[in-house]
Amino acid sequence: MARTTPINRYRNIGICAHVDAGKTTTTERILFYTGLSHKMGEVHDGAATTDWMVQEQERGITITSAAVTTFWQGSRGQYDNYRVNVIDTPGHVDFTIEVERSLRVLDGAVVVFCGTSGVEPQSETVWRQANKYGVPRIVYVNKMDRQGANFLRVVGQIKQRLGHTPVPVQLAIGSEENFAGQIDLIKMKAIYWNDDDKGTTYREEEIPAELMDLAEEYRSNMIEAAAEANEELMNKYLEGGELTIEEIKAGLRQRTIACEIVPAVCGSSFKNKGVPLVLDAVIDYLPAPTEIPPIQGVNPDNEEQVDERHASDDEPFSALAFKIATDPFVGTLTFTRVYSGVLSSGDSVINSVKGKKERVGRMVQMHANQRDEIKECRAGDIAALIGMKDVTTGDTLCSIEKPIILERMDFPEPVISVAVEPKTKADQEKMGIALGKLAQEDPSFRVQTDEETGQTIISGMGELHLDILVDRMRREFNVEANIGKPQVSYRETITKDNVEIEGKFVRQSGGRGQFGHCWIRFSTPDVDEKGNITEGLVFTNEVVGGVVPKEYIPAIQKGIEEQMKNGVVAGYPLIGLKATVFDGSYHDVDSNEMAFKVAASMATKQLAQKGGGKVLEPIMKVEVVTPEDYMGDVMGDLNRRRGLIQGMEDSVSGKVIRAEVPLGEMFGYATDVRSMSQGRASYSMEFSKYAEAPANIVETLVKKQG
């Protein structure tokens, strides 16, 4: 079966935004205008096509990114048929892992901002993630019909707060209830949308006289930005030549793909004014799979060797699994982005990360929650594979003959844990299965059993994250569970360098005894420029002259690692440590691996006193948006929670207060901040760093360990 759409007419895009910027409504309109969904889904009614989990429809927020394949021929049919794969991403900070995951497989993004609230805290998080993966993007300023909406103010905020160069290719005609349409700065025409067909068509008119000067000014800025793309355009521009529409678009496209500029458009998705032009901008400015650098990976047989795969059907097959979803009817769906080659149903591939073969049964292409079965997928496609046995998010699927491990995704460590207990004996087994499936879908969610209490502990990125997972357990797997109080993931570290400690374990009372003896030099872990500690143990062996035989060295390392897991001050894991074994002694008969492991563990335990052991607590970056009347209360409350106010600024919706607050003080904050402000303040929080916990907290924790 040949390719139906040439790969240069593919666009793999994500729609990213802050909560409530109108992202799901925008995606919904895209589906409507591309002819896939005949009745527009509204988030307000809980009926949007991409919000396909029950919880999303109830809460009106998007949690899972559904991948949807659509086709577009231009707002006036001016293009050949383009295949646009849209990945809807969540905007809630507890789900940044989903955003990170989808950005990893996108070629371009449409970042949606609200015309009233502009650049919000989460927008910065999403923007940073897009920078990390070098994703070209365009900006869509939505909700221009809302009170206080101002397109150019939001453009200014993008420049100032996100440090990027936005280039408006449109201007708004009117705003708030008088928002009428856009000025197309490339064609220099005013655009008014047709209400009778829900904004599918528009008419072009002359630009209103009072906006002409502004339009001229922004058009010349836009042309200058386009001319900087290459020498040829620059020379033409400097010599006073008029750039053609094609040249302007080509220049802007080249610079957008290089992540130098961000074209900006505006509209109101809810009022059906502007989404077809957002789609046109996707075609005009965002890259095809062939226009981004080839993806790189390592050879599983030789990790030093870097291989690359180009977006071509002729290269060996390679794809990245970026999302696992459990479907009640077909079982596990593995969403994959194909980077190179062709995959047909029935083929066998290798999961190069785990070294396991998988046979591909059925393949489907998703349209939000409906699916069409397909026989093959090619470079640039996004498809869901059914029946994969052992694939987790971030795994590479590739041809058996030419294996490659594509870049791994980094998943953040969870910061909050709660204990869950099944309500009845019957729920016990079901809960184990349910948690296993949820953990397979979401790598930022962990499940473990507390060895001392036997409780099942689940950990995640925030209270909302865990609430929703427990809710899904109830709905999808019929498991009723009781939830404990949230627990903070504390950590430990040491503060002294080059501490030399002796560990000696001797049991000799006749017969075969135990003898292990080592001297270890401990030092503090390295810290990166952001103040984050390098995790894990950096172990070196400097023993000379065989005073400790080689075969016991791994046992010493193991002893240190095991003690690190159990901590030295209050029973929390030591997050980073450098250890060098440099001396010791052994006994011909009584020494064994066990004895050296215990000796090393005993030496590590002494770090509490000798190494200046400290307990660290997670500090969260909190942003509260509150009307001015409640600002005093909110700030007083943050101070009571041991928060450090980092700064404040004005926004349309009131004051934005930025603070760093220990996670342990933030439980139940959602309810508190609402009651303080009569429901008018909102907040977002994300993990910032680990910092030393105050003495009174450490005392309580040590007592708890008993």
From Swiss-Prot:
The keyword Protein biosynthesis applies. NCBIfam families: EF-G, PRK12740.1-5, small_GTP. Belongs to the TRAFAC class translation factor GTPase superfamily. Classic translation factor GTPase family. EF-G/EF-2 subfamily. Keywords: Cytoplasm, Elongation factor, GTP-binding, Nucleotide-binding, Protein biosynthesis. It comes from Stutzerimonas stutzeri (strain A1501). This is Elongation factor G. One of its GO terms (cellular component) is cytoplasm. SMART domains: EFG_C (SM00838), EFG_IV (SM00889). SUPFAM superfamilies: EF-G C-terminal domain-like, P-loop containing nucleoside triphosphate hydrolases, Ribosomal protein S5 domain 2-like, Translation proteins. It holds the Pfam family EFG_III. Catalyzes the GTP-dependent ribosomal translocation step during translation elongation. During this step, the ribosome changes from the pre-translocational (PRE) to the post-translocational (POST) state as the newly formed A-site-bound peptidyl-tRNA and P-site-bound deacylated tRNA move to the P and E sites, respectively. Catalyzes the coordinated movement of the two tRNA molecules, the mRNA and conformational changes in the ribosome. GO terms for biological process: ribosome disassembly. It is found in: Cytoplasm. Residues 8-290 form the tr-type G domain.
